[in-house]
Amino acid sequence: MSQIDIRFFSHSLNRHTSFKMYIPDDKRNYGGVYDKQNMKTLFILHGYTQDGNNWIPEYISEKYNFAVVIPHGENSFWLDGLSTGHKYCTYVGEELIDYIRNTFGLAQTAEDTAIMGYSMGGFGALHTAFTYPDTFGKVCAMSSALIVHEIAGMKDGGDNGVANYAYYHECFGNPVSYTHLTLPTNRE
């Protein structure tokens, strides 16, 4: 098992950032089911106030013969920040995937590329997968923070116990613009 911590300059985020990657090079025998398949890539997006260290990427990587990539998304909801200029969706859906494919030769097709997340990361996984359907062939969202309708009615100075209006405004923009974040009910 190789664990790699990579730091590089991201044009989407306009700063240096880092991500972790796990590559199964000395696989244990888990029944031989995945031994002969090409290595696929799984992007895992962390939740609000987390940093990706709460997953078990080594197990996922070895058992399923996946390269696992865990980027840092701060508390961005994995969106392209309208006021900050930090484009987290673009970072994951374009820049990071290109970096992984070009540098490591992994997951050259959507069929071999999956994205998953928990809570805020689940929202980000759904949003990113639907924004880049030709990049991500599979998506898994666990306990996703699908809160755009809840916060759409929030007023300046409001708070929902997790964050305040100013934070949500920074992530999502004006409540009127939340409709562009609505996730489709079916995908063709």
Q: What label would you give each PLM region?
A:
Residues 1-181, 187:
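Non-catalytic cap/lid and distal C-terminal segments of serine-dependent acyl enzymes
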